Amino acid sequence: MNRIWLFFSVMFVIGTDTFLLSPLLPLLQDQFHVSTDLSGWMVSAYALGYALFAFIAGPISDRLNRKTVMLWGLAGFIVSTFLCGIAPSFAAMCLFRFAAGVSAAFVTPQIWASIPVIVQPSQIIKGMGIATAGLAASQMLGLPIGGFLASFTWHTPFFVLSACSLILLLILAAVMPGIRPSEPLARPSIVNPYRELFSLPKTSVILLAYFLFQTGNFASFSFLGTWLSADYHLTVSQIGAAMLVLGLGNMLGSLIGSRVSEKLGMFKTLISGMLLMGALYFALPFFPNLFLVEAGFFLTFFTAGIIFPLMMGVFQSIAPNARGTIASLSNAAMYAGTTVGTSIAGFLYQSTQHFGAVTGFTAILFILSMTLYQTISKTGKRQSTARAQL
């Protein structure tokens, strides 16, 4: 399991860059003199780059040494993140964020795809929970630290993050084992793995359910900083500190999620968690004070930490021989959802000037996603019953 903690570190730096824009968005909006709906494109550009290139990264990584792919991806991530720190304009920032997303698309799928290979089958969910905890830790520590660094200048968080990523790159190059494909013959086409996956009936349903969830999730998450700045008049460092409990909840949830799912069952835990998250997101703008908002942050992302590894487990169960492709597909769905969700949320927020329009949109998408996961669960039970009767 020691190797999993190395993945934890990679997910921490990638996650910090992914989530960093939420507390910085009000500051960068003023810096580049853009409206609320346009400011969301600094988040969407990263997500779009990731979503587009994740489709290529998965099949390629299934034919190459995953360590090599991860190192080159991380090198590109370091350069593009540094360039974000010197972006002279809104357009340049969006371009460099797009490049950072492209680079990250070649890193994180290697983590999700490698975990089932390097740990025992009984430890897969736990391993994914630890990797997910890296994302949660980036919210708990990376966001407030980024907010604190941004109190000096908005450039600083990007410079520090690229320096930390460089150190991690050197460590990975020295100690990370090579993970070569189990099948030595390369597939003739990048398209073929996706054709094979989508020939399975459950692939499209799982993909759509996850896309809807992440569209709703990032619609609200991306504008939390803007909302806290507008309604509670918090500074960028205060926004980062306010999000400390958000990351704490996510990390704790990801660490105990495997125990909860063992007791309640995977799909029961997943569906119940989505229902709770939807209710909490919807209620956020109506809480009367910041203390209750903080409590809502904790509970919402504690639940998210529990259910996210389960979603990854559902994805990885589709086709064990194409884990890299599946991991890229799931990440592409997440960042496509981020692009769509952030764009729609920016429009809703700008039009209504009320965060409740955004969280209401999130709640509706969670209900739709939950319905699809229920369909997947029922189909799986019917298939299990049919096999038992044969």
UniProtKB/Swiss-Prot annotation:
The keyword Cell membrane applies. The chain crosses the membrane at residues 4-24, 40-60, 68-88, 98-118, 130-150, 159-179, 205-225, 236-256, 273-293, 295-315, 329-349, 356-376. It is found in: Cell membrane. PROSITE patterns: MFS. Keywords: Cell membrane, Membrane, Transmembrane, Transmembrane helix, Transport. Its main location: membrane. GO terms for molecular function: transmembrane transporter activity. Pfam families: MFS_1 (PF07690). One of its GO terms (cellular component) is membrane. It comes from the Bacteria. InterPro entries: MFS, MFS_dom, MFS_Efflux_Transporters, MFS_trans_sf, Tet-R_TetA/multi-R_MdtG-like. CDD domains: MFS_NepI_like. It is a multi-pass membrane protein. PANTHER family: CHLORAMPHENICOL EFFLUX PUMP RV0191, PURINE EFFLUX PUMP PBUE. Belongs to the major facilitator superfamily. This is Uncharacterized MFS-type transporter YceJ. It comes from Bacillus subtilis (strain 168). The lineage of its organism: Bacteria, Bacillati, Bacillota, Bacilli, Bacillales.
